[in-house]
Amino acid sequence: MESNKIFGQELWGTLYTIAKDVKIQIEFNPNKVKEYRLIGYENRMLNNEDFNDDKKDAGEIGSGHTVTAIYEVVLSDGSESSGKVDPLNYQISSVVKSNDIMTLKIRYKKPNQDFSRLITEKVTEGDLKKSENTKNFMLAVSVAEFGMLLRDSEYKGSASFDHVLLWAKRAKGEDTYGYIAELITLVEKSKLLAKL
């Protein structure tokens, strides 16, 4: 099974790059989002000014591969302030009225080009609600929670192996290559080891 995974499904993704120097930038609407935290990627953070710098290297995406960024978000009713950020001295900090939760920007270069292209997408509460019940979302949440448990993250909160299993089993559906079944087995074994 492992050789089929490596040579059958993953080889072409490593041999054939479809995008290089891929960068993702998120801007949350402060009227809708009180606080947020990126889960994972601590070692891959870019400075804000590096997003538009075509000379700054970033990740590559191979054929058939995807990238997932997960944020923990505390929604706001728009009237409160977390009080954690000082006001700006040299910039206007007024908030634009909008129903968007965030703006997603993706910058990438085609493999044979040296200039980047920009994709900008607004995300609404409705968009988020639609994605909450997808199998991909459930799988991503279970993997992120599992990772926080394995490294005993200070942010794990009430995360548990049982919760990871619940979400992973909901995500299973058609598991053509057995990856989700393998995840479930790993979580079950980790749960047993954690009791020792």
Regions found by a protein language model. Give the residues of each.
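Acidic, polar loop-rich interaction surfaces within structured domains
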Residues: M1-D100
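Charge-rich, low-complexity amphipathic helices
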Residues: Q25, N29-V33, A168, L186, ...
